[in-house]
């Protein structure tokens, strides 16, 4: 199979730019003979999620794979400076969004279907000044494990992937912030990240996408409830 990877930019810019980015991706995929549609969806809103699932079913008549990848990761500040609104904003997208999408999708998915939650190394390890993000990703692992048990009788598998730093738009924004805290330029900071990874480099979007493709495939038909590290050996538990 062919692996398609596209970074649609930050969720924070969805109303401004990601719609155009999505349309561009759809156009490119159609040119490669993929049957694809783009659907704008606020994953933190029950009605929006339900409408998105309806649109998928209306077009395709079935839903086999769900990848919960919507996230906010650029609210980075010390815990005492966090507002409740900032906390809820991150949790509503990163965790509640995955819950709502999984719940609505499970109602129409059949035997052999698969849900993959894109968690993070932050689902297993704490990072300073990232309390909402880390909490949301830890919660995603709990959601993955519980959903896997609840949906197993329906033949639906649920797994998560846990990448470390990845060179997406969000990853670059995080690099810029943490490099500034250390008085480094972003490239030097990313080089330091690569040095602590046993395989010697920073993660690429394709690394995560390949893991997701495996978990969605029939080759992973007896795997559910897992949180797979995609970190070049940096995270091992």
Question: What function would you assign to each model-found segment?
Answer:
Residues 1-60, 74-75, 85, 176-177:
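Short-chain dehydrogenase/reductase
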Residues 73-76, 125, 201, 212-214, ...:
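Short C-terminal tail/terminal secondary-structure segment
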Residues 77-79, 86-88, 193:
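Substrate-binding pocket helix/loop in short-chain dehydrogenase/reductase
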Residues 79-80, 112, 125-131, 153-154, ...:
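Active-site loop immediately N-terminal to the catalytic Tyr-X3-Lys motif
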Residues 102, 136, 144:
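Active-site helix of classical SDR
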Residues 120:
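Residue(s) in the substrate-gating loop at a strand-loop-helix junction
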Residues 152, 157, 223-225:
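Short, small/polar-rich loop/turn modules that mediate ligand/substrate recognition or access, typified
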């Amino acid at each position: 199979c062919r692996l398609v990877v596209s970074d649609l930019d930050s969720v924070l810019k969805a109303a401004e730019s990601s719609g155009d980015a999505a349309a561009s991706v759809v156009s490119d995929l159609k040119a490669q003979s993929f049957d694809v549609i783009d659907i704008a969806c606020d994953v933190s809103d029950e009605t929006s999620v339900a409408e998105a699932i309806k649109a998928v079913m209306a077009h395709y008549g079935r839903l086999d794979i769900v990848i919960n990848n919507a996230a906010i990761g650029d609210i980075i500040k010390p815990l005492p400076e966090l507002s409740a609104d900032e906390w809820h904003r991150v949790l509503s997208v990163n965790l509640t969004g995955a819950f709502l999408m999984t719940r609505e999708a499970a109602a129409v998915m059949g035997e052999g279907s698969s849900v993959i939650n894109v968690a993070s190394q932050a689902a297993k390890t704490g990072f300073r000044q990232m309390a909402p993000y880390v909490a949301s990703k830890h919660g995603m692992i709990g959601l993955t494990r519980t959903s896997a048990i609840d949906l197993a009788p329906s033949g639906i598998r649920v797994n998560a992937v846990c990448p470390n730093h990845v060179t997406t738009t969000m990853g670059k924004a995080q690099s810029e912030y943490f490099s500034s805290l250390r008085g480094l330029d972003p490239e030097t900071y990313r080089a330091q990240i690569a040095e602590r990874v046993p395989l010697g480099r920073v993660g690429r979007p394709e690394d995560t996408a390949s893991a997701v493709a495996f978990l969605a495939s029939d080759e992973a038909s007896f795997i559910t409830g897992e949180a797979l590290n995609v970190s070049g050996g940096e995270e091992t538990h």
